Amino acid sequence: MEKFIGKLFIEGEIVLLTGLHIGGSKESGEIGGLDNPVIKTVKGIPYIPGSSLKGKVRCLLERKYGFQPERNSGDPCGCGRCDICLLFGAHSADNKTVSRLIIRDSYLDEDHFIKEVLKGNIEDITYTEEKTENIIDRIKGTAQHPRIMERVPAGARFRFLSSISFYENDNIESLIKSFIEGLRLLEDEYLGGSGTRGYGHIRFD
C-alpha cells in the first residue's frame, strides 16, 4: 500500500439548465400515477446520487480517450495505471487499486428552490414537475402510448461535494486535471435519463 499524502476537496453547485430525471422506485401503481418517478430521499425530496455522477463522468472520460472495453463485456477500464483507474478504481481483479475519488450524494438547495423556482409560493410545495411523453404512429401521425415522466425542473440547484485522495508517486496535477475535464465533459453531455430528448443539461458552479 502506497503512503497517503493528502486530500483535495472540490465543492460547488450543480445547476439544472433543463429538467432532470434520475429514476427511483415506483412505490404504487395507482391509475393515473407516474410511470417514471425520480429518486428521492425518505422525506420526498429529489437528490442526485453520487454513483450517478461518478459513473457518468468515468464513462465520458473513457469515451474521450478511446478506451475499448473487452468484446461483449462493456466493462470499464481495468489497467490499474491510467488516471481513470486511479481516480475511479480499476475494474479488473488483477489490477485492484485504491479509488482516489469520492463523490457524495448531491442534495437539493431547498431555500433556493422555493425562492427562485417556486417564486416564494409555499402553499403547495412540490419539488418536481410532470411531463407527458408519447410515441408518434408513423402511419397515422397520432400519439400513442402516453406516459408520465417526473423530473426536477430547470433552475434547481444541488450541493456538489467531492474529494480526491493522493498517494506517493501519484501525478497529482494530472489526476486533478482529468477529474475537472470529466466534469466539463458532463456539462457538454447530459446527466440522468432522456438526455437526447432535452433532459439533464447541467452546469457546475
Q: Which functions belong to the PLM regions below?
A:
Residues 1-205:
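RNA-binding basic/glycine-rich loop and surface signature characteristic of RAMP-family CRISPR effectors
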